[in-house]
Every structure is written in C-alpha cells, then in structure tokens.
Amino acid sequence: MPDAVKVGFVPFSTASRGTLVVFCDETLKFGRAAGKALGSSAGLVKRAAAANQFKGKSATTLDILAPEGLKADRLIVVGVGKTPALKSSDFLKLGGVIAGKVRSDNNGVTIIAELPSATMEPDLSASLASGIRLRAYKFDRYKTRKKEGDDAVNRADVSIAVADVAAAKKAFAPVNHVVNGVIIARDLVNEPPNVLYPEEFARRASRLRAMGVGIDVLDVKAMTKLGMGALLGVGQGSARPSRTVVMRWNGGKKGEPPVAFVGKGVCFDTGGISIKPANGMEEMKGDMGGAACVVGLMHALAARKAKVNAIGAIGIVENMPDGSAQRPGDIVTSMSGQTIEIINTDAEGRLVLADVLWYVARKFKPKVMIDLATLTGAIMVALGTEHAGLFSNNDELSERLTRAGLDTGERVWRMPLAPEYDKLIDSKFADMKNTGGRHGGSITAAQFLQRFVDDTPWAHLDIAGTAMGAPKSDINQSWGSGFGVRLLDRLVAEHYETKR
C-alpha cells in the first residue's frame, strides 16, 4: 500500500499554515515555542478551553478555528496530562490521536513537539511520528469507488517542529523501519485469500532478499523429503500447494546462535472436513497473522540493520475440504517422528507449527524460539482482545516478553503449562492427538506445541484475539493490526542484539 501520510521534522521557527497542533498540560500551560506561536492568542485559547470544558487531560483535544493573528487556519490543542509521567508509548498514542483529527486536512499540518514543563526528547518525537503513521494506515486497494474525502489523508503533509531536527531524524529512522514492518504485516493480513495463497505469500516473503535476508523456500517435494507429515496433511485438501519459508538475517557475531521466530500461516481456514460455520468464515483469511508478523519483523530487523542473528520461519497452507482432504481419525507422522491422531481437522495450526518448530530447533539450534499463531478461540474467551496469550517453558523469556509488551502496548499475559494439561492430549492410537477436549483449549494447544521444541527456551504467543478483528484503537483503525512486530522488535533490541 502507498504511504498514507507524509511525516517530517522541521525547526521550531517554521511557519505554521493549515493546521497548527500544540500540547498543553492539565494547568493549560504551553511550552515556550507553542506560546511564542500563539502569541497574544493564548488567552483566547484558554477561554475557548474553559467554554468547551477542556482540561488538558492526556489524549483529549480542543479543536477550534485559529484565532486572528495566527498564520494557521485551524488550531488543535492536545492534552498531555501530567508531563512527568509521560512515556514513549504515551506519545505513540498521542500521534494516533492527532492523525485521527487531521485525516481530512490537506492544507498541511504543523505539530509543535514541545512539552509544557519538560524537555521533549528525540525518542518521544519519534514515537509521535510513529503513532501518526500507524493511525493513518488504511487498506483500500480494492475499492474502485471512493467517497469524497477518502483520499484526503493521502495528501496530508505533517511537519513535526522540534528543537533538534537532526536528533529527531536519527531517533525516528530505526523506529520508522519497525512501523514499515507493522504495515507489511497489516497488508498481508488484510489481503483476500484468493490473492494471498501459499505460493504468493512465499513470493512476498522472498522480497526480503533485496534487503540482505537469506531466503529458503521449501516446496511440497522438499517437505516430503524432510518428513513434514503434520504440515503437509493440513494442506492436502487444497489445490494450492503448501510452502515453508525460512528467512535468515545475519547481523550479529559470526557463529552466534540466532533468535528464532516461527509463524502460523494458514492463508484460509475452512476448518477442513470439520468445517466451520459459514457465518464469519470470511475472517479466516487472517489465520496467517502469526506468519505475517514474522515477515514484518524480519523486514524491520533487516531494515534497521539489527545487530543480531535471527531466523524467521513460516509454514504456509490452506485448510480446505475435498476428496483428498485430511479426515478425523487419520494418523500422521510429524518430522520429529512423533505420531498424531487427528481428532478435529479445524485444529490445524498446531500441526503446521509442530513441523516448523522441530525443523528450526534442530537445524538452527536457536538461543530462544518464539512462535506466533492465531491458534485458538479459547484464548479470546480467556483474555479477550487486549492481551495475547503467552505460554513458555522459560521464566526469563516470559518476563522479557511481558516487559516488552508493557513498553510497546502490545501486551501479553502468561498462561499455565503443566503435566496435568499435557496428558489431556495423549492418544490411545498414536503418540498424541491434536485436540485435548473442550476445557483449557488454548493451554492444551500450547502443550501440544511444547512437544516439538526439545529443550530450546521457547514461548508461544496465541494472538487470535489481537492480530485481526480487534477493537479499533488510537494507533490502528484497520482490521489487521500487525500485532507482534513492535513487541518482538523491542525484545530483540533490549536483550539479544550485540552491543558494539
């Protein structure tokens, strides 16, 4: 998708035309540059605030015609609340709030990025710019008739006025690459399934070659030779052949074990022979949200030249019913040699992940391995749409993911793993079965995956409630959210990049 908005940094002295945006705290105090820009109009603005009961609380806005004397036509005052408590994630949200207010403004927007009572560091300006871009995103490439104003955001030119332009640009550069990764993930999730099928998904992931990412695409013949019977069983009812794509970024020390990310990529999930209800089935185009995140993350790591060795692996299939489709009662042999009784063909994502997890663990011996999957409806019953489910065999990794989630706003909540749950997936006829019954469904799904990771420090993120169809937020108005890219990039940056 073309970029929805142009964002740049300019000095405080830049003239403000079109819309002027300034910040104030709960005392309605403005920063020095904003006060200078407002001049004698500051008193009028405060009277307008009183008339509109605007109190400067965080993320609230006062939107008025610019008072006489300002070069701007429109003035938006954005509350920041109590400034000492502000964090980077707060400015991400504020950027989204501003983008939501100026979508229809094609006369230019200038934001004076200055706090009333504190210095606004370059990283906060970078977060502000990121929030603007994330909120401005929309997916409308298949609309041939557009309502008046639909394209206004494409003409929005946002200038962020800062004290140090060079420092702001430097801070924004790596963050902007991460935003691009989120947008890539959103685009993939939003694509219709007749356009984004396994072969096409593999082609799009392969575009990362141009950024220095090593790419291996395993076709059906290669996966058959490897013994990936669990993954191949899922796709055998589809006319679209399955693929596994392995992406390698070598930005760390030579020979250092990589961090690995594995994504579920079911491009469309009918449920197979255990077919889903027709109502809402169209949303199963997003059942590849985990794989989309991994591709977006690998883009971000490569684009910002992350000092880490990283593996991204995605298993890409369609789960369709036909005469050759997998049946309930079938027994398949996974790459690990473990056998699996198929109880429900709609519990297919764990079968895909089982083979890819085993392949990555054995071939690359990663220091940590994290998988992402829109795996279970049960996690939505447990956690709703505000947290992803986190399952892990490693406390340190779990704590790091939780912290990264709090820092980025992509929050996770740890769920239990225990032998009592694991025994629920034992089978009378095979080593295990692919469902463990009605209760604790997200837990038994994670227990299934754990059988394919050996002793690798591992975490599973069930993103069924956060990757697609989640409630709209200040930084996302799209059906596909791109959840996980910012979370995992933060994890890598904080804990796994080489310090040079």
Curated annotation (Swiss-Prot):
SUPFAM superfamilies xrefs: Macro domain-like, Zn-dependent exopeptidases
Required co-factors: Mn(2+)
This protein's GO CC annotations: cytoplasm
GO MF, any single term: manganese ion binding
Entry's EC annotation: 3.4.11.1, 3.4.11.10
Pfam family membership, one: Peptidase_M17_N
Recorded catalytic activity of this chain's protein: Release of an N-terminal amino acid, Xaa-|-Yaa-, in which Xaa is preferably Leu, but may be other amino acids including Pro although not Arg or Lys, and Yaa may be Pro. Amino acid amides and methyl esters are also readily hydrolyzed, but rates on arylamides are exceedingly low; Release of an N-terminal amino acid, preferentially leucine, but not glutamic or aspartic acids
Gene3D superfamilies given in the database record: Leucine Aminopeptidase, subunit E, domain 1, Zn peptidases
Keywords, in A-Z order: Aminopeptidase, Cytoplasm, Hydrolase, Manganese, Metal-binding, Protease
Cofactor notes: Binds 2 manganese ions per subunit.
Plastid keyword on record: no
Catalytic residue list: 276, 350
Localisation: Cytoplasm
Binding positions (Mn(2+) 2): 264, 269, 287, 348
UniProt-annotated binding residues for Mn(2+) 1: 269, 346, 348
Biological processes annotated in GO: proteolysis
Xref: HAMAP family: Cytosol_peptidase_M17 (MF_00181)
Function: Presumably involved in the processing and regular turnover of intracellular proteins. Catalyzes the removal of unsubstituted N-terminal amino acids from various peptides.
PANTHER family (UniProt xref): CYTOSOL AMINOPEPTIDASE, LEUCINE AMINOPEPTIDASE-RELATED
Protein family membership: Belongs to the peptidase M17 family.
Protein name: Probable cytosol aminopeptidase
Gene, per the UniProt record: pepA
